[in-house]
Amino acid sequence: MAPFLASPIRLHPCPLLFSHPHLFGSDYFAFSVKGRGAHLESMRVENKRGNRSWGTDAKRTHPNSIFNQLVRYGYIGTGFPDMNCSLTWSLIGGPSTLSLPSFFPSAHLLLSLALFFFLCIQSNHRMSKSGCERCRGRGFWDTDDQDTYFFKVMIGGFRRQMTIPYKFAENFRDQIQGTIKLKARNGNTCSVLVDKCSNKLVLTKGWAEFANSHDIKMGDFLVFRYTGNSQFEVKIFDPSGCVKAASHNAVNIGQHAQNMQGDPIEILSCSDEHLRAQSLTTERQNQPEKDVIDNCNKKMKTEHASSSEDDQETPTAEVHRMKVEEMVRAIHSNHPVFVAVMKKSNVTRQPCYVAISRKYANEYFPGGDQMLTLQRHGKRWQVKFCISKRKLRMLSKGWRKFTRDNELQHWAPLALFITLFFSPHFRKMKKCGQKMRKLNTRSTARDDQEKYFFKVMIGDFHKRMTIPDKFARHFKGVISKTIKLEPRSGYTFDVQVTKKLNILVLGSGWESFVNAHDLNMGDFLVFKYNGDFLLQVLIFDPSGCEKSTSCSMENAIDHVGQGWKEHNDISTSYHDQPKGNKHWMQKDSSSKGNKIGNTRSSNTPSKFSGCILPRGTCLPVVQEKKMKEKIQAIHSKTPMYGNVMTKCNVSGSPCVLEITQLYDDAYLPFNNGQELMLRHRDKSWKVRFYRFKNKSRKLTQASSLYKMRRPGARCREGHAHFNGNHIDGQYKNFFKVMIGRFRERMIIPNEFLQYFRGKIPRTIKLQLRDGCTYDVQVTKNLGKISLQSGWKAFVTAHDLQMGDFLVFSYDGISKLKVLIFGPSGCEKVHSRSTLKNATHCGEKWEEPLHISSNSHDLPVKSPQNVSKSEKQWDSSEQENDTANIEEVALQGDDLQGHPVLNCILPKHTRLTDMQKQQLESKVGAIHSEIPIYGCILRKSRVHGKSQTVDICREYADVYLPFKELNMTLQRHGKNWEVLCRTKDTRTKRLSTGWSRFAQENNLQVGDICLFELLKKKEYSMNVHIIPKK
């Protein structure tokens, strides 16, 4: 609706200034329209920044045709008064104002005011009108809808610029460009310029500083949320899906110089006059950056006047001030920056050094002489910081190499006055009461009580072991000089911690731990930090199974069960004793008198629910549990006596076994020297019982038959097998390294299968630390048990990569608890997004299946009708599919009359000796990790109208878990698309496309087709043919 005036009135040119709700940031535009009557002379739209303008000569043109172009861009409403006018108005972001000449007549003033407010009301009315589909569709930039998101993945040249998605960019006006603010999670903001390039909105100037300050890398994931007022909130995620920890360099860019409170800038050189110069005052708290630079300039002028001939080559203070100002703005550091102007003496004098002011050195290098690391362009140099006899703080040893590698030549003008910045690795602690940034708790998924890392024993692991840097951060700079290592045996070892080149190293005491547990090259150790500087250790051998330490501990510990200090009454129950781990003090093998002595125990005979132990006996959890089971199985009315075998009991001279006086007085009414009979496993031995003057009771003579010799290699293997199968009925451990084709399946070590005691369910649950579980089916192929169906979904959900380490812990009830470690040795933390593919544990478990020695090379996975997209099995179907693996294997023998290694044939297949020999030779030449499916072609498969090939259910359920899919058959470099679908009998049938494959490859009746499933290509098969003739 166009405004209307009763009679034509001539208006003097005057600016009408009013706000416009569509403007972006500080951009504003000017629209100039001049003309008389129904014709306009010209119209021009100009960006007041001068970087964009457009106009048109509108002679003999009706004003509505001109203003319709403005309407098209949404800046004004439709129509314009048909009158003689000459108006100029500007759209800005400020308040509505009106400016008129002072000599303007009152009548004209009233008419101008009426016209102005009418246009404002028309524009605002049309913008707020709910029926404006154009406005609602475009989602204008500064509308009330502020919760607008988009994300970007950092790929390609993301460091230079970033393009805003096209759909989101529709919120910008086509002609609007300006500056937006990016706000990170730590509250720091950065101003970034938005430019239009090839009809795309691009973040250019300021984006590189934002990316560098927040350490954004390739593959990072950024989520942008528009909060209004041209400001975005940015959340940064790393490739693992976790929120990225805020970088120490993430400061408020653009206001860095103003916000650095109390951070001085030191500008010094190596001349004696400069060494006596004082550092800049720290009264920079409320001083703007320009004043700081001016102070630097004044100081440089003073130094310049008093310098030597070398210093006379110094450029003007103004040039130096500009360089310093530019570099200060370019560096974004939370630490004070030290500036040193390079002189001729800094690069040519012998010895070559650069001096650092005393105030700066005392505050940020308080440790005296130390080695520092200088970084430039990704390279590092070790430089020594020292204090000379003249109390000068300087960088000396290694500085000359730094100058040479960076080509700092004194004759080059740029090299003479290069300004170097040193940002120390120490953070200046703020005084109490100042506002301090809160720690980023989200970046730490759990508290410090349960942190894991692993180490592989390689190199000179016998002498020392380094702790990963990422794990060392959990100590938060506070580390004890001694840390405790606690293996599964329950004994603790004190190991000293030293720091070498900023790396934590386990030194003194580590060698004793290695010898006690017989650690060898390739062993795999998992450490769990439980607080109070205690590391629990799991030890694995190269096979991936947990290593038994009982035998090796026997060699390292001289006395077990002796030297106990605490004393309790015999009537005291064992369970009333304070629980604690046995603690051993070690000395390195290099020191004399190397012994591992017991320093902590309880020390009176104790009653163990029907068993009396000697004073001070403290058993590990494993032995305690086994002892309880043994006592309950015996059902003795008389309390039993138990003792822990020590060195003197099995190898002493004489070899004796001591019995406590209290037990003797109550239950051994024998005469001194009386013979007793000991029985074990249907054998008997005679021993003699003695009472000595020191009131000790001992069994001697024949007890030497019980002598336990130091185990050899064969004995150790037997002990390892026995202890591994009998210690602690739950939580057996093994590990796997993700190498090769780990995404398809994972093989369980044969040594670990003994813990299942011959029984394993068809489905095993994998449980992560966050509590979510994944159902993975178990198959048997080529004599190996592997996790297959469902394993790929687990790998994908947790983004397992080549080189990752997985530690599995079996709880005894068909559940494997999993810890995931990255190649760095530290535990990987995953986002909550992995929960969507997980199924929580149920209360019911499947009946276990018996693994018989009769099972051969056939897959034993339970048949399931699942589609390709299905990643979890329905629990009700699983309960109905449990069967005996031995029965399946026997069926396999019936199905496959002539079994061939790594090849599955359909039921009732009969091969001649020649065919079997050819088949074994062909299968062996293929070297396929996945079993090959073979079939003999009958007439219906190569002749007739409906030529098809059936794949047996046993193979299809395991390796072709889909209902219908187009598969690719390959032979001699050619490809054929063949439809594979599921029949009612749950077998797979190759139908559409098979006849063409058979004709082009000239297949004949009696030929043997071998289908090799390829791993690199999804559901592609390489076909091998053995001709009949």
Swiss-Prot record:
Q: Which GO terms describe its cellular component?
A: nucleus
Q: Where is the signal peptide?
A: none
* Annotated DNA-binding residue span(s): 147-240, 339-430, 450-543, 731-824, 934-1029
What is the protein's given name? Putative B3 domain-containing protein Os03g0621600
- The source's superkingdom equals Eukaryota
Q: Which cysteines are joined by disulfide bonds?
A: none
Entry's localization field: Nucleus
Keyword Endoplasmic reticulum in record? no
Listed GO molecular functions? DNA binding
Residues covered by region (Disordered): 572-605, 852-882
Keywords for the protein's UniProt record, in alphabetical order? DNA-binding, Nucleus, Repeat, Transcription, Transcription regulation
Primary location class: nucleus
Q: Record keywords: Lipid biosynthesis included?
A: no
Q: Show the ranges annotated as biased composition (Polar residues).
A: 591-605, 852-867
Identify one Pfam family in the record: B3
